[in-house]
Amino acid sequence: MPRYLSLVRVQENTIDMADADPGFEARMGALFEEITKAGVMLDTAGLRPTAESSRLTWSDGKVSVTDGPFTETKEVVGGYALLQCKDRAEAMEWSRRFLAVHPPHWTVGLEVREVEEMPGA
């Protein structure tokens, strides 16, 4: 069965958990319980702020390191979910439901990509 990586994209400086409505955590918990019981969720997590991260770049035969925050970047990956679904349509539906539990005044995006399986893996 194919796996899909759902990358949560946020504008890091505009999301404040203290600004979430009172039912947000309960809605998210209920969705995570449902998706886990359905056997779809393989792994998920939020990510620490970009101020605590580093970027490594390979160029001209060398690795360069840039420490965050990355102020030039508007959107950042704020979390991920690894889903195992029967098809892309199912992955998209779970992803749509994930977005719908967020407070309406937040802007959150998802990029859903199928994981390319290596032959023999």
What is the meaning of each model-derived region?
Residues 1-121:
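Conserved, structured core segments of small domains
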